[in-house]
Regions:
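Extracellular fibronectin type III
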Residues: 135-152
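Structural beta-strand segments of beta-rich domains
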Residues: 53-57
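Proline/serine/threonine-rich low-complexity linkers at boundaries of modular beta-sandwich domains
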Residues: 28-40
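Recognizes extended acidic, P/S/T-rich segments that occur
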Residues: 70-121
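Extracellular acidic, Ser/Thr/Pro-rich low-complexity tracts
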Residues: 61-66, 134
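C-terminal motif of bacterial Sec signal peptides marking the signal peptidase cleavage site
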Residues: 22-25
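Bacterial N-terminal signal peptides that target proteins for export
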Residues: 2-14
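Beta-strand-rich modules
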Residues: 117-139
Length: 152
């Protein structure tokens, strides 16, 4: 005759709970990912002004504007000099100015951003585009419309 030993109910419940916790701990883990539809922003408006050798961009954002991190200003001089582009050619930026948070030429106030890009030729016309990067690397950069900035 064999003797069966019955486990007490609390002990078997504890074993079952331990097995359940052990199995759930083996799952795939990853960092939370941003939801693009909720975390994106866009340029609502971008106004361009010129002051001597500077381009001043007054921008307004919509959407989740708090996620704006870095702003790049893409510039292409338009003219007849070597290396200049033309107004009807495809946009080919010749220089990119990067404004990280806290940079000297970048000012943020709620959903408004002011960028001042200097050291430009005050006699030249420039094609300008603003590109905003999110704090979440998984979200694509957001580019503004292409604008033309003529000297005063």
């Amino acid at each position: 005759m064999t003797k069966h030993q019955n486990l007490p109910v609390p002990r078997s419940a504890a074993l079952l709970l331990a097995a359940l916790l052990l199995c759930t701990a083996c799952g795939k883990r990853e960092w939370p990912t941003p939801v693009a539809s909720e975390d994106k922003f866009r340029w609502r408006s971008v106004e361009v002004q010129r002051n001597q050798g500077c381009v001043i961009l007054n921008c307004e954002l919509s959407g989740n504007w708090q996620n704006l991190d870095t702003v790049n200003v893409l510039l292409e001089p338009v003219g007849t000099a070597p290396g200049d582009g033309c107004a009807s050619c495809p946009f080919t930026p010749r220089s990119t100015l990067i404004f990280a948070p806290g940079a000297a030429g970048l000012r943020k106030d709620m959903n408004r951003v002011a960028v001042t890009a200097c050291e430009l030729d005050p006699q030249k016309t420039y094609r300008v585009q603003v590109v905003g990067f999110s704090v979440f690397p998984g979200i694509s950069p957001v580019a503004s419309e292409l604008m033309l900035s003529a000297p005063k």
